[in-house]
Amino acid sequence: MVVDYENIANTIDFYALDGKRSFSRSYQIDFNVEPVRRLTVSATFRYTDARIEMKERGLTEKPLTSRYKGVLNLQYATNLNKWVFDFTASINGKSRVYSFMEGLRDENGKLLYKDGYSPAYPLLYLQVTKRFKGIDIYLGAENLTNFRQKNLLVGTPMEGTAGHGGMAAVNTALPDFDASAVWGPIMGTKVYLGLRYTLWK
């Protein structure tokens, strides 16, 4: 089953492959090492080639699917694992956006997807854990780069309104409204505090 957002304007088209091609090839490399005692370094790189044959367009790159992703994780634990420090950095590759997104512009009038692809973007995560007998207390932060997808809502701007980042609010009543064209983070930096309790071992 193909879910096609691009065949007919303002319409989601559902149809069977009917002998057409659809595939996803993924290649992944993993690397793990402990350069010094209690310090673990892990790295992963994945490349994805996902394509689907669309009506009258032939074999097309699957939209909103990242071409590649790289992840680096550093974890250090003190003696007896009383403290654990965890840092993760990732780079997320570009992905093809829907054709109706190619004309979208930012608050300065610049095209967001001039080549038809989303930008590559980095993400950083940090977590510190203090371990007691049967209880872990952890403090962490996600998306430390505070990267967020611009113009998350697609549609016709409403006159006389200003939304996030100075952009006009989108008219949700019109048929060109779309809130599903998501390729990146929609929330900025988030800090959290948690408690983990072990009932038994």
Which residue stretches match the model-derived regions?
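Feature marks flexible
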Residues: 2, 14-16, 184-185, 189
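Exposed loop/turn and edge beta-strand positions of beta-sandwich/beta-sheet ligand-binding modules
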Residues: 25, 68, 122, 135, ...
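Short Gly/Pro-enriched turn/cap motifs at secondary-structure boundaries
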Residues: 19, 116-117, 183
